[in-house]
């Protein structure tokens, strides 16, 4: 369904010109039968509020938590991103949450950031040569356009494990004056357009749930189960949260409003 994907991305980030659209020509068509699976879902997990909320709503051994660290904005020059420190931090995060949710887990590393995409050049060409000027493009640009494609480096694993349903925690923002405004690379229209080999995204978790309510749900779920988890929300690409950026501050306030101390949830 490449034409559908292209049309949807054009609607959000474009309009794109028809001649920009690539194509895939199959020389041979063969039947692909997905193997039987003991799993129901892949739940994408970054450690943030949206991802943890998706995890607590889909716990247990029938679900596989999948983390793709390169979806996050990472500066190539920093050791915690190009070396083992950053990867080890992500492994620890998903391993600890898998113990909380009692799900299996998988961490996928790729070379998209380091070797495949020259992000600065692509962003510049899209703006100056292709003249993209949509509201969504100015909001998150090439980072948003590549987001789901990068996330779908998990696709071969999903197929090999026989998993047909992909679950993504929604980052949709509820804005009363413009309720359907969602200028993010994880826009539900974009994820809904992606279908391949019997695999597709399910309805995004928490699509119409406010962030403050998600944090409250996480706290209540953990307290009911007698468990605790870290929540990773920092804008910084360091292995430690700064606790002073916008995302850190608002998450800590959400935790306080839920009656908890942020220190016990990965802050400070």
Residue ranges of predicted features:
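Nucleotide-activated chemistry modules centered on ATP-dependent adenylation/adenylyltransferase
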Residues: 1-41, 49-268
């Amino acid at each position: 369904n490449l034409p559908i994907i292209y049309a949807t991305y054009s609607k959000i980030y474009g309009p794109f010109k028809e001649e920009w659209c690539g194509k895939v020509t199959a020389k041979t068509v063969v039947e692909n039968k997905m193997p039987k699976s003991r799993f129901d879902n892949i739940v994408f997990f970054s450690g943030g509020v949206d991802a943890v909320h998706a995890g607590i709503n889909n716990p247990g051994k029938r679900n596989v938590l999948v983390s793709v660290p390169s979806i996050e904005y990472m500066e190539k020059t920093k050791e915690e991103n190009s070396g083992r420190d950053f990867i080890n931090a992500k492994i620890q995060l998903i391993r600890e949450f898998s113990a909380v949710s009692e799900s299996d887990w998988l961490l996928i590393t790729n070379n998209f950031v380091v070797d495949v995409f020259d992000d600065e050049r692509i962003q510049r060409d899209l703006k100056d040569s292709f003249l993209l000027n949509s509201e969504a493009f100015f909001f998150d640009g090439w980072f948003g356009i590549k987001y789901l494609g990068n996330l779908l480096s998990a696709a071969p694993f999903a197929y090999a494990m026989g998993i047909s349903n992909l679950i993504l925690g929604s980052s949709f923002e509820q804005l009363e004056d413009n309720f359907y405004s969602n200028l993010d690379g994880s826009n539900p229209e974009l994820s809904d357009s992606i279908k391949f080999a019997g695999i597709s995204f399910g309805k995004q978790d928490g699509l119409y749930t406010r962030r403050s309510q998600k944090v409250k749900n996480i706290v209540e779920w953990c307290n009911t189960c007698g468990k605790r988890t870290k929540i990773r929300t920092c804008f910084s690409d360091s292995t430690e949260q700064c606790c002073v950026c916008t995302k850190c501050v608002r998450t800590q306030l959400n935790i306080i409003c839920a009656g908890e101390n942020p220190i016990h949830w990965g802050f400070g």
